[in-house]
Amino acid sequence: MTERVSSGAPWEPVIGYSRAVRAGNTIYVSGCTATVEGEVVAVGDAYEQTRLALQGVIDALARLGAEPQHVVRTRVYVTDITRWPDIGRAHGEVFGDIRPASTMVEVAALLDPRMLVEVEATAWTGDAGPA
């Protein structure tokens, strides 16, 4: 069974993607940024943009019945890798005890030049595996 959710972002139907998709026990969350009602917020603040992007991930997970502790992988796209301490601090505040696999990559640009950070995640809601 596949279930999809939208965040209501104006570009989702234009580009043709879902905010998150559940396929069985796996949830894939598309890249989340610091946007509110289609507007970039916390311009220039990498920590706050990361915090808001992660809240977007958490909100998408919740709509599909999952929580942050279900996250097994994050990918963090940043436009300035020298800001990694602030970005990492925000990520650690959410995932410090969960410690998913994670990659942070510098990219040339995101959809809007005011965006500094984009976070995508994969979550697993199945059994915990061998003890």
Report residues per predicted region.
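Short, polar/acidic, helix-capping and beta-turn segments at strand->helix junctions
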Residues: 1-131
